[in-house]
């Protein structure tokens, strides 16, 4: 009975990217702030990616905080954001979709840890 996040993509999608994204997560596994992938496969008419459940995005938090963060919050978040992006770069990939919606806070014992998600547009360099 553990809660997880499930990302679905129609197998009829014009530009399928979930298989590619699942392979990228496998390359990045073990990095701080990279969600753990539980399973990738096909079910009925869908490609399915199952990963650890995470908390709110930076966009969600920014809205919750009336679109104002303290300097301390900005600096603490920026430090983690830069670290996540640098880690992706050490694996010779660029994310190509950096935005507040793609940075999520962890939950439980990881509630102060920032995670980077959505590698569907990432490219090797």
Curated annotation (Swiss-Prot):
PROSITE patterns (UniProt xref): PROTEIN_KINASE_DOM (PS50011), PROTEIN_KINASE_ST (PS00108)
GO molecular function terms noted in the UniProt entry: ATP binding; protein kinase activity; protein serine kinase activity; protein serine/threonine kinase activity
A GO-annotated cellular component: ciliary basal body
GO biological process, one term: Wnt signaling pathway
Record's subcellular location: Cytoplasm; Cytoplasm, Cytoskeleton, Microtubule organizing center, Centrosome; Chromosome, Centromere, Kinetochore; Nucleus speckle
Record's keyword terms, sorted: ATP-binding, Cell cycle, Cell division, Cell projection, Centromere, Chromosome, Cytoplasm, Cytoskeleton, Kinase, Kinetochore, Mitosis, Nucleotide-binding, Nucleus, Phosphoprotein, Serine/threonine-protein kinase, Transferase, Wnt signaling pathway
Main location: cytoplasm
Record domain Protein kinase: where: 1-125
Keyword GTP-binding assigned: no
Positions contributing to ATP binding: 7
Catalytic site positions: 97 (proton acceptor)
Enzyme Commission number(s) from the entry: 2.7.11.1
Enzyme class of the recorded protein, top EC level: transferase
Post-translational modification (record): Phosphorylated by MTOR in response to mitogenic stimulation, leading to its activation.
Superkingdom of origin: Eukaryota
Catalytic activity annotation: L-seryl-[protein] + ATP = O-phospho-L-seryl-[protein] + ADP + H(+); L-threonyl-[protein] + ATP = O-phospho-L-threonyl-[protein] + ADP + H(+)
Protein's UniProt keywords contain Lyase: no
Job of this protein: Casein kinases are operationally defined by their preferential utilization of acidic proteins such as caseins as substrates. It can phosphorylate a large number of proteins. Participates in Wnt signaling. Phosphorylates CTNNB1 at 'Ser-45'. May phosphorylate PER1 and PER2. May play a role in segregating chromosomes during mitosis. May play a role in keratin cytoskeleton disassembly and thereby, it may regulate epithelial cell migration. Acts as a positive regulator of mTORC1 and mTORC2 signaling in response to nutrients by mediating phosphorylation of DEPTOR inhibitor.
Family in the record: Belongs to the protein kinase superfamily. CK1 Ser/Thr protein kinase family. Casein kinase I subfamily.
Quaternary state and interactors: Interacts with the Axin complex. Interacts with TUT1, leading to TUT1 phosphorylation. Interacts with FAM83A, FAM83B, FAM83C, FAM83D, FAM83E, FAM83F, FAM83G and FAM83H (via DUF1669). Interaction with FAM83H recruits CSNK1A1 to keratin filaments.
Protein name (Swiss-Prot/TrEMBL): Casein kinase I isoform alpha
Gene: CSNK1A1
């Amino acid at each position: 009975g553990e809660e997880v996040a499930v990302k679905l993509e129609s197998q009829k999608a014009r530009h399928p990217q979930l298989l590619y994204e699942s392979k990228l997560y496998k390359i990045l596994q073990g990095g701080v702030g990279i969600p753990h992938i539980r399973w990738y496969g096909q079910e009925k008419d869908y490609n399915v990616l199952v990963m650890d459940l995470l908390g709110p995005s930076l966009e969600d938090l920014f809205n919750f905080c009336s679109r104002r963060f303290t300097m301390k919050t900005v600096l603490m978040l920026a430090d983690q954001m830069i670290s996540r992006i640098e880690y992706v770069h050490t694996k010779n990939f660029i994310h190509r979709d950096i935005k507040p919606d793609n940075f999520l806070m962890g939950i439980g014992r990881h509630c102060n840890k920032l995670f980077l998600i959505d590698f569907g547009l990432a490219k090797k360099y």
